């Protein structure tokens, strides 16, 4: 079967860039002095027996981060960024991830084999340590996984003379593997980033700096007698099987090639079931990137892989691959500033890249990537290894690496309430995703704008919307809670205290009600909104003008409005999950405190500069507005936004204390009497709610609550209650909620970890 010139036959509009990607990144855990740590793999990261994203490689201190399959290089890096964020915040606070492929100074006896549950995996690692030595096992890197797109493969298949898709794909990936190994020196030259080994790593003197220790024969390679042919897939499979039968290899995965066929559990299955994708294993960690690989590297490699497919297969495969290995070794061992040797035929690569880009009409971005490759071929200063040279001090990169590691650690802990790369999603959803990754629960974002997730563990699948809307809630429950009239009736029928009031469907009806409430404290609010939108509170009798404004604000949010009695006391939010109170929050209304110098408008701007404040529930605290509601509140207190407040004078900008309207959060879970927590849970249960926010007004929290004498009033139940405000509070310890959501959804994971 010949595949030469097949790519050239495709239409220019063919989906040439269609592919699936995955990244595996290895990194060592070190302390803040750059020394290897001897702590076990973090227990908060769940069980390594099933964790899909965070594993240990050879050493107990060597983390392996694994992305799910992504449809683009950008999404693959986004996955890796999030997993790196989780890993960085799951290790001990005095630990960081080493950003280099080559380890810091170490002794062989320091290296502890990963303490895995699987007997074979432990035995396998002990075998490797005995055979290859332990120091080499501490070398880390990046594995770049790629599957050609389904439509692209189908288009190539249609252009071929083949009738068997599995055989065709096998031939396609075999050709790609052959040319990748033939030209692997290109990867080493451009992206090699392990120019030195720290003192004591090798027993003998090794010339340095070089382009890549890891990608030379000084790195992690098989014994010289292991020679596997890539002439055919059958030859490849049979050779490895023979080495295992002879005892030269213990398992198929002990064959360490720069490229590995993937998609089946055993190699022989490739012959009848087919190769699914390729794993390219010869990438050094890029220490200039927090996640170890840049976007331009990902996309340049993608182009190079397609160029290898564009090029013809070698006529003599074994000879071409042997020459490619020798050339790679020469380039890996050469000084980072040494030009490419004459036998490195860069023109073949450049021509293939140019023709590929031209044939498929790729845009400026990909054209610029090709220009960068050409420039690096001409000038080794532009290669990654050369860029590391200025940071070598006394034949060591330890100081540079530690500074980078600490900087990346600090970045992980910046805005630690968010999940890196997913900041545009709701904060509660980000927190749930963080915990899902940490626990080892598979995830897929079904609709990012709608905050809709698919979570699964083995065959157990759960769908989650907005952080806590799940199959555990009956469909009608959130509909009932969205309707405040229905909520009040259900609670009242169950014997729980609710405020009295009336409902109106027009401004005229509401205004006609004014004579009945003109001398009363009242609350005006929309019938069916959440997050405190459109609510006005009058602790003093409202004038007709202010009452009308409050009605207009409420009607702007809904077609029906409630006017209720104002209940004096302190408002608390109780978070109820599955019949149990998990958190209690005191919310202080949006406010500013004067300094005698600045206007209220300026004080609001100062308070909004707090990095914890943001918009759309993506930060623990919300931006304070100066809209109609806030200005009405100021007017009731005799102020305008441009007035200067006296020093120490506190002015509230809202009557309602919702965090979503700029309030402050104070965690009082540990001090709130359990009787109120139990009463709030009973209210949620009466609604049939699984996850529910219960808002209680409590005049005196020292009084013990009972159903007969509740000493409180329920002013609202909230479906899809915010979780972040309970965890990241303005004051108090905070309560983790999202992890409890996951524990309830996947109790088998909790059971498996105890």
Swiss-Prot record:
GO cellular component terms, semicolon-separated: cytosol
Gene that this sequence comes from: gshAB
Function: Synthesizes glutathione from L-glutamate and L-cysteine via gamma-L-glutamyl-L-cysteine.
Pathway(s) of this molecule: Sulfur metabolism; glutathione biosynthesis; glutathione from L-cysteine and L-glutamate: step 1/2; Sulfur metabolism; glutathione biosynthesis; glutathione from L-cysteine and L-glutamate: step 2/2
This enzyme's EC code(s): 6.3.2.2, 6.3.2.3
Region Glutamate--cysteine ligase: start-end pairs: 1-332
Entry binding sites for Mn(2+) 1: 695, 716
Assembly behavior: Monomer.
Positions of transmembrane segments: none
Record-annotated ATP-grasp domain positions: 488-746
Keyword Translocase: no
HAMAP family found in the cross-reference section: Glut_biosynth (MF_00782)
InterPro entries: ATP-grasp (IPR011761), Gln_synth/guanido_kin_cat_dom (IPR014746), Glu_cys_ligase (IPR007370), Glut_biosynth (IPR006335), Glut_cys_ligase (IPR006334), GshAB_ATP-grasp (IPR040657)
This protein's record includes keyword Glycoprotein: no
Record keywords: ATP-binding, Glutathione biosynthesis, Ligase, Magnesium, Manganese, Metal-binding, Multifunctional enzyme, Nucleotide-binding
Residues reported in the UniProt entry to bind Mn(2+) 2: 716, 718
Annotated positions binding ATP: 515-573
Binding site for Mg(2+) 1: 695, 716
UniProt organism field: Streptococcus thermophilus (strain CNRZ 1066)
Protein's name in the database: Glutathione biosynthesis bifunctional protein GshAB
Cofactor note: Binds 2 magnesium or manganese ions per subunit.
A Pfam family assignment: Glu_cys_ligase
């Amino acid at each position: 079967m010949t595949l030469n010139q097949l790519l050239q036959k495709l239409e220019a509009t063919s989906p040439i860039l269609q592919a699936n990607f995955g990244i595996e990144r290895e990194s060592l855990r070190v302390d803040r002095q750059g020394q290897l740590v001897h702590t076990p793999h973090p227990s908060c990261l769940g069980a390594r027996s099933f964790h899909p994203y965070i594993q240990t490689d050879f050493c107990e201190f060597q983390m392996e981060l694994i992305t799910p399959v992504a449809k683009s290089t950008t999404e693959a890096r986004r996955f890796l960024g999030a997993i790196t964020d989780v890993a960085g915040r799951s290790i001990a606070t005095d630990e960081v991830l080493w950003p280099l492929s080559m380890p810091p100074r170490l002794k062989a006896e320091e290296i502890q084999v990963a303490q895995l549950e699987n007997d074979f995996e432990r035995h396998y690692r002990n075998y490797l340590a005995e055979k290859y030595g332990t120091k080499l096992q501490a070398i880390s890197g990046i594995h770049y996984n790629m599957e050609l797109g389904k439509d692209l493969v189908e288009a190539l298949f249609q252009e071929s003379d083949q009738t068997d898709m599995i055989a065709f794909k096998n031939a396609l990936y075999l050709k790609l593997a052959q040319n990748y190994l033939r030209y692997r020196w290109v990867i080493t030259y451009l992206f090699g980033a392990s120019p030195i080994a720290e003192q004591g790593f090798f027993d003998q003197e090794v010339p340095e700096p070089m382009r890549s220790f890891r990608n030379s024969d000084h790195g992690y390679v098989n014994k010289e007698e292991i020679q596997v042919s890539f002439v055919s897939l059958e030859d490849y499979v049979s050779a490895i099987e023979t080495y295992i039968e002879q005892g030269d290899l213990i398992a198929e995965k002990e064959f360490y090639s720069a490229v590995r066929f993937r998609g089946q559990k055993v190699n022989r299955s490739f012959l009848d079931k087919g190769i699914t994708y390729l794993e390219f294993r010869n990438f050094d960690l890029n220490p200039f990137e927090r996640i170890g690989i840049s976007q331009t590297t990902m996309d340049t490699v993608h182009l190079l892989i397609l160029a290898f497919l564009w090029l013809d297969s070698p006529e003599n495969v074994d000879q071409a691959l042997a020459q490619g290995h020798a050339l790679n070794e020469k380039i890996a061992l050469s000084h980072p500033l040494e030009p490419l040797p004459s036998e490195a035929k860069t023109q073949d690569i450049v021509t293939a890249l140019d023709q590929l880009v031209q044939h498929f009409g790729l845009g400026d971005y990909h054209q610029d990537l090709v220009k960068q490759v050409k420039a690096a071929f001409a000038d080794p200063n532009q290669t990654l290894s050369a860029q590391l040279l200025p940071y070598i001090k006394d034949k060591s990169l330890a100081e540079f690496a530690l500074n980078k590691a600490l900087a990346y650690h600090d970045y992980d802990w910046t805005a630690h309430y968010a999940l890196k790369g997913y900041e545009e999603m709701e904060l509660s959803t980000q927190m749930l995703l963080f915990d899902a990754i940490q626990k080892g629960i598979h995830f897929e974002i079904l609709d990012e704008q709608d905050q809709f997730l698919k979570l699964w563990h083995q065959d157990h699948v759960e769908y989650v919307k907005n952080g806590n809307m799940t199959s555990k809630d009956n469909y009608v429950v959130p509909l009932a809670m969205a309707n405040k009239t229905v909520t009040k009736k259900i609670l009242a029928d169950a014997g729980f205290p609710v405020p009295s009031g009336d409902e109106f469907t027009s401004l005229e009806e509401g205004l006609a009600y004014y004579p009945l409430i003109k001398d009363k404290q009242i609350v005006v609010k929309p019938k069916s909104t959440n997050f405190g939108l459109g609510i006005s509170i009058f602790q003093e009798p409202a004038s007709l003008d202010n009452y009308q404004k409050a009605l207009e604000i409420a009607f702007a949010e809904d077609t029906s409005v409630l006017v209720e009695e104002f209940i004096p006391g302190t408002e608390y939010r109780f978070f109820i999950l599955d019949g149990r109170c998990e958190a209690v929050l005191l919310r202080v209304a949006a406010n500013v405190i004067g300094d005698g110098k600045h206007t209220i408008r300026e004080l609001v701007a100062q308070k909004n500069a707090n990095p914890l404040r943001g918009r759309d529930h993506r930060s623990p605290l919300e931006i304070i507005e100066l809209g109609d509601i806030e200005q009405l509140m100021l007017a009731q207190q005799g102020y305008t936004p441009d007035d200067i407040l006296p020093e120490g004078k506190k002015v509230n900008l809202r009557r309602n204390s919702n965090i979503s309207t700029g309030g402050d959060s104070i965690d009082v879970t540990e001090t709130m009497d359990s009787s109120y927590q139990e009463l709030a849970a009973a209210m949620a249960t009466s609604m049939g709610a699984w996850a529910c926010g219960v808002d209680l007004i409590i005049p005196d929290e020292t009084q013990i609550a009972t159903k007969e004498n509740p000493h409180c009033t329920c002013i609202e139940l909230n479906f899809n209650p915010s979780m972040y405000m309970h965890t990241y509070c303005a004051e108090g310890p905070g309560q983790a909620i999202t992890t409890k959501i996951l524990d309830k959804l996947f109790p088998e994971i909790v059971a498996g970890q105890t």
